[in-house]
């Protein structure tokens, strides 16, 4: 990545409550991504291995912006910002072609904060957003990315007149990853409103309600969705022959796509306390988290068919947790600081699965309730002086095991979900630093 920035700021004029400040600027970025397979990979020296395709991608981003801070009255500040971005199409100098198209958008943000008193602050904001997909999401050539995590029936078994490229019975099919040239940028509207209250110098409470609405949200069609409705997602199927296979079979293209709309709403909250304990030191405690009110999205290919993953394993092969919070207590005694951290995620309904009941020998459909998951972490820091310190920490202090889940979206990582719980159990680490 190469780039440059230019910025300038200064006071425009003065109001009774203070000076009105204006800042302007511009930035330029050139992103470059190159892949060159080795000669051995290209020439087949490596047994049973397909060389990755060669490419050399580049893209330019330009942006200009302006921001102003206005002291409306004593204690009340307003902020307004405007930005314009242009993101060029992607050039592949190796294959001598372009991907996507040049995209431009203007976005803005309005915010205000009102210091009602020394103890109470009110705040709020509203704005728009623009986010272009990364280069690989648009222009990466199709490559083999292993196989589907679960076994599926043939997506297109045919009408009996020929021999479709199906695998026998239920099987894992090759999964391909690559770019989607038709991928569009995400656009969003978001707003927040909240407060911070400090009744004493040793205690504070804060809460912010937030809402984000996405248009042309970038996500993907899961293998479950595609194999569950292959007719609707026929464009995501092709044929592919692995080096070890005698013939090509159907393969699933796991590409990023614009799923349509997404709506997320929640409340971020925090309690914090501080006190000095004679003979022990400074004790600081905080409790913060997010309460998710809504997390919905449209099914790929639709504009108003909403579904969600709130408190359950959703069609997008993910979970939106109703409650996530962290509690932390630190005691600083001279040069030594001890910190204990508690991390929590609420439980959820697992993916519905068909399993064999060993007591009856028959298949049955079940859906587990995955319990809440929490861990304790410890960290001790000793500062020898301003330059040197040593850290000793224990992650997952009480060796909590990941909760059982029957989801099958992570290949051979079965029985737990590595996105939400670590299989490493208790982990001890030691580190040090010296600044000079």
Please report, for each region that a protein language model flagged, where it lies by residue:
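Surface-exposed extracellular loop regions of Gram-negative outer-membrane beta-barrel proteins
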Residues: 22-31, 36, 56-115, 119-186, 188, 209-244, 395-415, ...
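Transmembrane beta-strands of outer-membrane beta-barrel pores
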Residues: 12, 28-34, 82-88, 126-132, ...
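Short loop/turn motifs that connect adjacent beta-strands in outer-membrane beta-barrel proteins
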Residues: 13-21, 72-76, 119, 201-202, ...
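C-terminal beta-signal and adjacent terminal beta-strands/loops
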Residues: 204, 293-294, 343-356, 381-436
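Outer-membrane beta-barrel transmembrane domain signature of Gram-negative proteins
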Residues: 1-79, 301-330
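Outer-membrane beta-barrel signature, preferentially recognizing the C-terminal barrel domain
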Residues: 57-59, 132-206, 247, 252-267, ...
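Gram-negative outer-membrane beta-barrel transporters
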Residues: 204-352
């Amino acid at each position: 990545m190469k780039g440059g920035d230019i910025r300038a700021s200064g006071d425009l004029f003065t109001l009774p409550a203070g000076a009105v400040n204006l800042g302007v600027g511009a930035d330029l970025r050139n992103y470059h991504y190159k892949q060159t397979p080795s000669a051995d990979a290209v020439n087949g020296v490596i047994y049973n291995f397909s060389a990755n395709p060669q490419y050399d991608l580049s893209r330019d981003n330009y942006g200009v912006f302006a921001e102003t801070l206005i002291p409306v009255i004593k204690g009340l500040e307003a902020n307004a910002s405007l930005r314009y971005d242009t993101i060029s199409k992607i050039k592949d100098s190796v294959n001598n072609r372009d991907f996507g198209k040049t995209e431009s958008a203007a976005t803005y943000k309005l915010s205000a904060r009102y210091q009602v008193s020394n103890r109470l602050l009110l705040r709020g904001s509203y704005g728009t957003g623009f986010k272009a997909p990364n280069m690989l999401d648009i222009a990466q050539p199709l490559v083999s990315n292993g196989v589907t995590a679960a076994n599926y029936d043939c997506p297109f078994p045919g009408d009996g007149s020929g021999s479709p490229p199906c695998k026998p019975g239920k099987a894992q099919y090759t999964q391909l990853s690559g770019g989607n040239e038709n991928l569009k940028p995400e656009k969003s509207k978001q707003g927040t409103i909240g407060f911070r209250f400090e009744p004493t110098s040793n205690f504070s409470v804060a809460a912010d309600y937030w809402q984000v609405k996405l248009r042309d949200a970038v996500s993907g069609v899961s293998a479950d969705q595609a194999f569950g409705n292959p007719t609707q997602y026929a464009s995501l199927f092709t044929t592919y022959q692995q080096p070890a296979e005698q013939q090509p079979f159907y393969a699933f293209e796991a590409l990023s796509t614009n799923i349509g709309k997404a709506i997320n709403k929640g409340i971020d909250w925090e309690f914090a306390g501080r006190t000095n304990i004679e003979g022990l030191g400074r004790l600081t405690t905080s409790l913060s988290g997010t309460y998710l009110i809504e997390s919905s999205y449209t099914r790929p290919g639709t504009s108003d068919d909403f579904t969600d993953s709130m408190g359950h394993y959703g069609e997008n092969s993910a979970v939106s947790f109703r409650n996530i919070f962290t509690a932390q207590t630190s005691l600083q005694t001279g040069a030594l600081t001890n910190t204990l951290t508690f991390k929590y995620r609420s439980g959820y309904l697992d993916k519905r699965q068909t399993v064999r009941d060993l007591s009856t020998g028959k298949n049955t459909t079940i859906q587990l309730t995955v319990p809440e998951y929490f861990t304790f972490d410890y960290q001790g820091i000793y500062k020898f002086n301003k330059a040197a310190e040593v850290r000793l920490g224990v992650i997952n202090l009480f060796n909590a095991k990941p909760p059982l889940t029957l989801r099958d979206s992570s290949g051979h990582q079965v029985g737990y979900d590595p996105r939400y719980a670590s299989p490493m159990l208790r982990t001890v680490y030691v580190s040090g630093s010296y600044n000079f």
